[in-house]
Amino acid sequence: MTEFVVAIPARYAASRLPGKPLRLLGGEPLVLHVARRALQAGAGEVWVATDDQRIADALSGLAEVKVAMTATSHASGTDRLAECARIAGWADDTVVVNLQGDEPFAPAAGIRAVAQALVEGNAPMSTLATAVEDAETLFDPNVVKLVRNVRNEAMYFSRAPIAWHRDGFARSREVLPEGHAWLRHIGIYGYRAGFLQQFAAMPPGRLEQVESLEQLRVLEAGYPISVAISPEPFPAGIDTPEDLERAEALLQTLAAR
């Protein structure tokens, strides 16, 4: 199995769900669920990069998880993880998986898959995708879509429905046209620790600013991103109170099995 470490950015002041890492899911803080998922995936180290002591305190019961207290001024999770990597002292060739702090149902196989995609590909960065199941998801601007080339590398990420099915969508936008498969991006990333520092040092790109998608900075700078298909279902992360309610229902369903 590919050796890797997991870093989880956990900022307290989330705009759409303030205090998100500490919101309770099944009676426990959200960040605790995410950290356990990383441990279950077999990561050599699991770090949570945060800017708030309350989040660090919530993790005190997980001895295997380390906490990096990072600056409150970081503009993005990538910047926060770059500081975490420096604190951890990872060598430049260390495989780092960036697991978002709002992914309490991230499957262990998916976490391992993004690390494997990095090692097996020729790109300095990797990520995951899964199939879009319905038209509502495809047209939702909060759901990021992507297209990839024959080398399984990302060509573009967008909040818009890509590729645009000219004839099919002219007929209806209520159902997905037959004969084409769309991909939903899963916001988990893999990179070597050295490239993570490069990424954080790059200036924001024009497309990144238009779409508000940080990964576009890498494509605009001319670097490829390997895209693997998640080997297991990868439920969407938690961004809103409604998402948290759905997550609570899913947790209860899983517990009843």
Swiss-Prot record:
Keywords from the UniProt entry: Cytoplasm, Lipopolysaccharide biosynthesis, Nucleotidyltransferase, Transferase
GO CC terms in record: cytosol
Signal peptide: none
InterPro entries named among the record's database cross-references: Cytidylyl_trans (IPR003329), KdsB (IPR004528), Nucleotide-diphossugar_trans (IPR029044)
GO biological process: CMP-keto-3-deoxy-D-manno-octulosonic acid biosynthetic process; lipopolysaccharide biosynthetic process
Keyword Plastid belongs to the record: no
Compartments where found: Cytoplasm
Catalytic activity, EC: 2.7.7.38
Pathway note: Nucleotide-sugar biosynthesis; CMP-3-deoxy-D-manno-octulosonate biosynthesis; CMP-3-deoxy-D-manno-octulosonate from 3-deoxy-D-manno-octulosonate and CTP: step 1/1; Bacterial outer membrane biogenesis; lipopolysaccharide biosynthesis
Main function: Activates KDO (a required 8-carbon sugar) for incorporation into bacterial lipopolysaccharide in Gram-negative bacteria.
Protein name listed in UniProt: 3-deoxy-manno-octulosonate cytidylyltransferase
Gene label: kdsB
